[in-house]
Amino acid sequence: MSYWCEATVVDGIVTRAVRITAGVDGRIDDVTAGVPRRDDDIALGVVMPGAGNAHSHAFHRLLRGRTHGAGGDFWLWREAMYAAASRLDPALYREVARAVFAEMLVCGYTAVGEFHYLHHRHDGAAYAEPHAMELALAHAARDVGIRLVLLDTVYLAGGIGAPLEPRQRAFGDGSAVGWLRRWHALDAALPVDGLVTLGAAIHSVRAVSRGDIRTVVDGLPPHVPLHVHVSEQPRENAESFAAYGLSPVGVLAEAGALGPRLALVHGTHLSDADVAAVGAAGAHVVMCPTTEADLGDGIGPARRLADAGARIALGSDQNAVVDPFLEMRGLEAGERLASGRRGCFDPAALAGAAGAGGYAALGLGSHALAVGDHCDLVEVDTASIRTAGSALAQLPLSATAADVRRVVVAGRVVADGGILVGAGDGTGTAGTDPATLLRSAIAAVDGDAAREESR
């Protein structure tokens, strides 16, 4: 399959008349610039590397537009999140994830890292198929054609030194060894198709002890990407210091987790010493600007982290907003508000965080529309009410998800003008507007909750 692009925008460089050829493995075989279109080329307009959503909780999408009436903070919002989690079984989980992944796809995300901890029944018992919830996510990704890195998460405690609460029992595996046993079994059970890969996550230092973090790190293959929530709230820092005399970053470093494969999610409340340690380790930091704003988390030290050597990526997290352009803009907006300066991250750096940064944090390799890279790309409308007149290299600060036209994953068009083209899997998603899938999934979850309440 070959695509002739009117222009590509990579690392802030605009290149005209580019042919990108994808091989049967879905990777780029050839890139040639300054060439005329051939009859067998698929013609695209302005193309950018697809965005890699480095942090998502798909089921949190159920809360969009439903948690703003009572004010509160992150901890109050978490109560609503637990209630949403309690409604899900494998069938509903697949339906919700399929709808959310479809929304991501048409909005310009070509890959997603799903930070997944809904492993078991609500009472903590395993399903008859022990990987039912994980396979639901894998099937959902294949249903729509998005690239998925399943970040299977270890979650063992309800707080430092505290047991899981009853509403958290679905998250736990009893011990770090028990989680590792299930993780390796899942690795063997996931079909190998190039679209879905397995990663790992530690929920947080609140949910996994220092000793268990060490066990997890030692028990995982060294190539597997490892993610962890870090310092999203000041309370987490206070609890970590009270228990260990260390910040969460310090705990991770002491447990052997801090290094180039680690992706720290949020990092909103890091000390100068934390920033230096993360940068020196060459770790990834996944900022989630729209979620951090929605939950009132604060503004993280993104520029200082990047200057220290950390690699910045972006994620939609709770999916209150699904728009990679707004995440890019939010990263820069936070820095401007905190510093009083413009241009803390230039457009090329913002696009790099959304694209190459996300793919690197997810262990997906280089992502620069180069030979050997995944052929994952998005076409952007440059003549819309938002983008008309914009310099192509500055699209990260003018476009939105509404400007995404065609989306290509693994060398195949999977979305066009906000509509799924179809992954060729026989699930009937071709021609579907993701809004239809979302309405259906939300209605199914709401109906299930209503039936429970009436019993």
What are the residue ranges of the model-derived segments?
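Metal-coordinating catalytic core of metallo-dependent amide/deamination hydrolases
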Residues: 125-265
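His/Asp/Glu-enriched, well-ordered alpha-helical/loop segment
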Residues: 254-257, 261, 303-383
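Alpha-helical scaffold segments that flank or form the walls of functional sites
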Residues: 65-147, 178-193, 439-450
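Histidine-centered catalytic micro-motifs
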Residues: 49-61, 225-232
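N-terminal metal-binding scaffold of metallo-dependent hydrolase/deaminase domains
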Residues: 1-36, 46-47
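Active-site gating loops and adjacent loop-to-helix segments of metal-dependent hydrolytic enzymes
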Residues: 62-96, 121-130, 157-177, 234-259, ...
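C-terminal cap of metal-dependent C-N hydrolases
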Residues: 374-425, 430-439
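Acidic, glycine-enriched loop/beta-strand segments at the rims
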Residues: 8-17, 295-297, 302, 359-397, ...
